[in-house]
Amino acid sequence: MTSCIFCKIISGEIPSAKLYETAKSYAFFDIDPLSKGHVLVIPKEHAEKMHQLSDDSLTDILVIAKKIALALKVENYNILQNNGALAHQVVPHVHFHLIPKTKNEGLGIGWKPIGSNIEEINKQAEELRKLL
């Protein structure tokens, strides 16, 4: 996609601090990191949301993220992937953030459970199993 910033990074039209590349994926340092070592791993295949991505590309991304996490030698890290504007996706191209977490750096999460009960959860599980 010609207007996509990540597609332009992959093509070399926009420079990046490339770390790793395969036939299917590209990994580079985030230019606005939350912590030292904050990396983005993106598919070369353009897709806006994860469920639109091929299984091969998705597998490749996760293997690369694992390889980079091991190379960074960080004990704690987050893998973050957002889908859609309401989920805080800013660039409409699938991307996985690998964010090393230290005491003073990294991703901060405010987790607010919506409340539920086991009957509701079991009903939801039954309905979803039928679709899988």
PLM region descriptions:
Residues 1-132:
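HIT superfamily nucleotide-processing domains
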